[in-house]
């Protein structure tokens, strides 16, 4: 390389990653599978009803009744830009959900988001395992090389969870979104 050659990044495999799809990811404490509104919405409603705080930093919710909640879950199941997965405990009860989103196969970059865990799932071995199973699927099966976690800068619990799971803090996206009429960094 001559002195006139600017520095550039390392050569990488430019083969695009695969788009996520329907998959069942089994673990020791539970299972992650593609969201199915008809099977999962009733248990998710039972686990999350009255837990308004879990929706504080997310665009949807809280939901006043099961009909409105089921409509949201059904729309999430049909979403082709954000692929939603359900977390099931070993008794096959749906106790949370999340999505793979901001999917950029050509760059091999994907984000986990829309993380909604019922209180029974929060800070448990299953919550950690579910995140691990989804990340492993993204890296090892689909071929992504970057797996992102973004959250509201004010969501201390989400920031702690990201750090505990091994994500590296890279900064704050100022005025990134408007959620429920409020600025979200």
Predicted regions span which residues?
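Conserved active-site tyrosine of GNAT-family acetyltransferases
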Residues: 162
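Conserved GNAT acetyl-CoA-binding A-motif
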Residues: 140-150
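Glycine-rich acyl-CoA binding loop
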Residues: 127
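GNAT-family acyltransferases
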Residues: 1-124, 137, 141, 182-184
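Conserved catalytic-core motifs of GNAT/GCN5-like acyltransferases
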Residues: 168-183
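Alpha-helical, largely C-terminal catalytic domains
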Residues: 134
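Conserved beta-strand-loop-alpha-helix junction that forms the acyl-donor binding cleft
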Residues: 149-159
């Amino acid at each position: 390389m001559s002195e006139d050659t600017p520095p550039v990044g390392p050569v990488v495999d430019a083969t695009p990653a695969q788009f996520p799809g329907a998959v069942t990811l089994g673990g020791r404490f539970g299972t992650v599978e593609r969201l199915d509104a008809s099977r999962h919405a009733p248990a998710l409603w039972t686990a999350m009803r009255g837990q308004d705080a879990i929706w504080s930093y997310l665009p949807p919710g809280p939901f006043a009744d099961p009909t409105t909640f089921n409509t949201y879950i059904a729309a999430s199941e049909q979403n082709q830009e954000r692929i939603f997965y359900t977390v099931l405990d070993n008794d096959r009860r749906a106790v949370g959900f999340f999505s793979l989103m901001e999917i950029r196969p050509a760059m091999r970059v994907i984000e986990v988001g829309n993380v909604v865990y019922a209180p029974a799932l929060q800070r448990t071995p299953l919550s950690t395992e579910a995140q691990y199973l989804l990340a492993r699927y993204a890296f090892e099966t689909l071929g992504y090389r970057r797996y992102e976690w973004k959250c509201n800068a004010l969501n201390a619990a989400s920031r702690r969870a990201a750090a505990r799971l091994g994500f590296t803090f890279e900064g704050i996206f100022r005025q990134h979104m408007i959620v429920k009429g409020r600025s979200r960094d």
